[in-house]
Structure formats: C-alpha cells, structure tokens
C-alpha cells in the first residue's frame, strides 16, 4: 500500500503519463471491524483525501474500492448486528461530500459462510492424561488463532457419528509443528 503523501505525489504528476488514467483509490484497512466509529474515521479520512485531491490537483476520483473489513461470525458466541452495522455504514457513505462510484470488497464477511472446512483424523494419542486427535489440516487452513482465541468455540460437527454419546474429551490439533495449532 501507499500513504496519502504518495497518493498526492502520483496525482500531481499524472499528466506526465498520457496513457495512464487513474480512476480512483483502492482502500483496505483491516478486518473483523464492528465499530461504526472506526469506520466513520476511515470514511472521513478518505473523503477528506478525495476533497484535497480535487481542490489541490483538480483531480476527481471516479471510483473508490473499499475493503470494509466487516466481521465474520467464526464462533458460536460471536454476535454481530449486521442490520445495524451495514445500515450505519450505508449512512456514512451517503454523508460523504465526494461522490465516487463505490465498490465494496466484502471479503470474509460474505465468504466465511459460503463453505465448510472438512478434515479427518489421521492420528490419535494420549499424553499425560490428555487426549489428542491429529487432523490433516491446521491453523494454516482456517482463521483461528488457537492461543489468542483459545476459549472460543468454533462450529463443529462430527460426520457419521452423531448418534453415539461422547464419553471422553479430546483436543483437536492440526498438522503443523506448533503448540499453537489447536483447532
């Protein structure tokens, strides 16, 4: 990425490149954002930059591609009020002074619910009274930081054995050689 000073420099020199047409700005700033205050700060900053580019360089951005960083509910206890978040965000966009064509890149907020992660057990072991199941995937296949989110529970179902009662607790671990690869 580039910062606003670099954007200004590029826009100030755009006429030196007759075959280059700069349509707008692409902005991505993070993920798992649930705060309208944070989104407002970002939109205000973007709007102010677009206004400055118009006033200082007579450049009007036709397009703004915005990676919103909207959250995805990865865990059972995650609660996201999507109506409030998206409604508030739409209002913030409507309040912008500059009016580029806006394309939203929704990323994981929309893709996270579009599939399932399947894995299977490749090994099992017991170590000092703790049961471990090793699976053929790991934290490199899903966004789940075992150490950071250790108390959160991902959605889980066991295919083919739903009617058998669970009599033991097992730790499910990925195939990476890391103590943090706990699913």
For the regions a language model picked out, list residue spans one by one:
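Active-site-proximal beta-alpha core segment in soluble small-molecule metabolic enzymes
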Residues: 1-63, 88
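Short, surface-exposed, polar/charged, turn-prone segments marking secondary-structure boundaries
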Residues: 3-11, 52-55, 92-94, 129-133, ...
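Basic, gly/Ser/Thr/Pro-rich low-complexity segments located predominantly at protein N termini
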Residues: 6, 29, 35, 72-74, ...
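Secondary-structure transition/capping motifs at alpha-helix termini
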Residues: 17-20, 52-60, 95-100, 124-131
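Glycine-rich beta-strand-to-loop/alpha-helix junction loops that act as flexible
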Residues: 28-31, 64-73, 106-109
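Short glycine/threonine-rich loop-to-helix capping motif typified by GTGT followed
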Residues: 35-41, 73-85, 112-123
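Alpha-helix-loop-beta-strand connector modules within alpha/beta enzyme cores
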Residues: 46, 85-97
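Charged (often Lys/Glu-rich) extended helix/loop segments that serve as interaction or gating elements
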Residues: 88, 101-183
């Amino acid at each position: 990425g580039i910062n606003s000073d670099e954007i200004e420099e590029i826009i100030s020199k755009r006429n030196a490149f007759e075959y280059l047409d700069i349509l707008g700005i692409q902005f991505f700033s993070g993920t798992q954002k649930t705060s309208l205050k944070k989104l407002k700060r970002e939109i205000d900053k973007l709007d102010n930059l677009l206004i400055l580019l118009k006033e200082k360089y007579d450049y009007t951005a036709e397009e703004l591609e915005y990676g919103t960083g909207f959250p995805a509910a990865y865990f059972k206890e995650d609660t996201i009020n999507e109506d409030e978040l998206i409604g508030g965000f739409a209002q913030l966009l409507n309040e912008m002074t500059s009016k580029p064509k806006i394309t939203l890149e929704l990323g994981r907020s929309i893709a996270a619910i579009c599939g399932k992660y399947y894995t299977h057990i490749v090994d099992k072991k017991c170590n000092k009274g703790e049961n471990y199941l090793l699976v053929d995937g790991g934290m490199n296949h899903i966004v789940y930081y075992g150490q950071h989110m250790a108390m959160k529970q991902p959605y889980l179902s066991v295919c083919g054995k739903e009617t058998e009662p669970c009599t033991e607790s097992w730790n499910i671990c990925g195939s990476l050689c890391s103590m943090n690869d706990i699913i």
